[in-house]
UniProtKB/Swiss-Prot annotation:
EC number: 2.1.1.74
The protein's name: Methylenetetrahydrofolate--tRNA-(uracil-5-)-methyltransferase TrmFO
Gene source species: Agrobacterium fabrum (strain C58 / ATCC 33970)
NCBIfam families: gid_trmFO (TIGR00137), PRK05335.1 (NF003739)
Positions with a binding annotation for FAD: 13-18
Molecular function as annotated in GO: flavin adenine dinucleotide binding; tRNA (uracil(54)-C5)-methyltransferase activity, 5,10-methylenetetrahydrofolate-dependent
Length: 481
């Protein structure tokens, strides 16, 4: 009998999830064939053919593992030997408390690591239908831009309608075209993050009159029309800037243009009415992206409208914004707890196609799918992460934590989800104890302690699940309640 331990597992899709899945499989000692169509067929959003290309922001969001759910999942992925987080750490650029990367260096590093791994074979080809059963165990991680043929095959197999929404891309501009006589460097609340200085963002201030003129221009700007197949809702976590403006004139002041925690270095006594932040986009510091400024405005409109922002009147854009479609399946109905398709258990799904949202979330589900597939190939039962971990919480949401009801008016449907503390199980009663000497303990202080306790529990349980020891960082030790 053939030793199935040494027969390869196939992974379809070389994005963040597929790359992570392939790495986890190979690091488990199982050969893997990674199929990626870019290089043969492109997409509407990708620019090149490297693996794990970042098409939206260059930020993996907060790296604070003490009281931020995203930082917790970063830390858990590091414990699990994540390729994506390792390459992000290696190619990070200053971004306050966030983990942001040089996008080209990052994706090239992922590509090199996989192509040079002795158990990984990268095949550049489009998979146009469901993988044949002869392939055996297969992970489908084709992401938000799944090719039409494969999407149709998945729909035919599942009998479920595919759901789609839009991810929006923010503009990127050249640093030397920014007027620093108006703008200034500062991270919000002067926060120092990994590789940062507390002055990692370029800030563009607006007074009330400038803000209102800008809002009017955003709302009046022509947008790119939708195709018939794109008639689906936006994901609230990635709304185009003009859609946010249409929802209320003050929406942006309480969102990506909020002025809190920022002091104009050129005029410190005058509080800005609104602030546009620019975040470093590459290691050289020559490119900056407009934080939260994803848009569907026409290219001809974007440059004119965004040059209305003080300090950007002569801005030169390396890339203008745009939108692309995102497709995902009804995972709670279709997948089992180890991410297998119930109707075809030889197939697993991973990444954004499962209904998670965000770079690290996609990669983390790829990490789990890869570990599950490798264990199964070696004749072992997949070890599921504890529900108290970030990995376990996200897995639970995808495979059954979502609530739906057929008999309630306006029933809730499965929606993409970022990792957040709302997905974690509650602490045991009595876990939150008022510190000695504190008279009033509620509100923000109590919330911070709760998050710290949930984060600490998650990392402890994750380390135990993986069978590894974890040494807390100095930052985490200082934050321990």
């Amino acid at each position: 009998m053939q030793d199935k331990t040494h027969s390869p597992i196939h992974v379809v899709g070389g994005g963040l999830a597929g790359s992570e899945a392939a790495w986890q499989i190979a690091e488990s000692g199982v050969p893997v064939i990674l199929h990626e169509m870019r290089g043969v067929r492109g997409t509407d959003a990708h620019k090149g053919d490297t693996l794990a290309e970042l098409v939206c922001s260059n930020s993996f969001r907060s790296d604070d593992a003490t009281a931020n759910a995203v930082g917790v999942i970063h830390a858990e992925m590091r414990l699990a030997g994540s390729l994506i987080i390792a390459c992000a750490d290696k190619h990070q650029v200053p971004a306050g408390g966030a983990l942001a990367v040089d996008r080209d260096g990052f994706s090239q590093a992922v590509t090199d690591m996989l192509e040079n791994h002795p158990l990984v074979t990268v095949v550049r080809e489009e998979v146009t239908g469901l993988p044949p059963k002869e392939w055996g165990s297969t992970v489908i991680a084709t992401g938000p831009l799944t090719s039409p043929d494969l999407a149709a095959a998945v729909q035919a197999e599942t009998g479920e309608d595919a759901l789609a929404f839009f991810d929006a891309i923010a503009p990127i501009l050249h640093r030397d075209s920014i007027n620093m006589d108006i703008c200034w460097y500062q991270s919000r609340y002067d926060k120092v993050g990994p590789g940062g200085t507390g002055k990692d963002y370029i800030n563009c201030p607006m007074d009330e009159e400038q803000y209102n003129v800008f809002i009017d221009a955003l709302i009046a700007g022509d947008t790119v029309g939708f195709k018939e197949w794109e008639g689906t809702p936006y994901f609230d976590g990635c709304l185009p800037i003009e859609i946010m403006a249409e929802r209320g004139r003050q929406t942006l002041r309480h969102g990506p243009m909020k002025p809190m925690g920022l002091t104009n270095a050129h005029n410190p006594t005058v509080k800005a009415y609104a602030v546009v932040q620019l975040r470093q986009d590459n290691a050289l510091g020559t490119l900056y992206n407009m934080v939260g400024f994803q848009t569907k405005l026409k290219y001809s409109v974007q440059a004119d409208v965004f040059r209305m922002i003080p300090g950007l009147e002569n801005a030169e854009f390396a890339r203008l914004g745009g939108l692309h479609r995102n497709t995902y399946i009804d995972s709670p109905i279709l997948l089992d707890r180890s991410l297998r398709l119930k109707s075809r258990p030889d197939l697993r799904f991973a990444g954004q196609i499962t209904g998670c949202e965000g770079y690290v979330e996609s990669a983390s589900v790829g990490l789990l799918a890869g570990r599950f597939a490798a264990a199964e190939r070696k004749g072992e039962a997949p070890s599921l992460p504890p529900a108290t971990t970030a990995l376990g919480s996200l897995l639970n949401h995808i495979t059954g934590g979502h609530l739906s009801s057929d008999d309630e008016p306006g029933k809730r449907s499965f929606q993409p989800m970022n990792i957040n503390f709302g997905l974690f199980p509650e602490l045991e009663p009595g876990s939150i104890v008022k510190p000695d000497g504190v008279k009033r303990f509620r509100g923000k202080d109590k919330t911070i302690m709760k998050r710290q306790l949930v984060a600490a529990r998650a990392l402890k349980d994750c380390a135990a699940w993986l069978g590894v020891e974890r040494v807390a960082t100095e930052q985490e030790s200082d934050a321990t309640p």
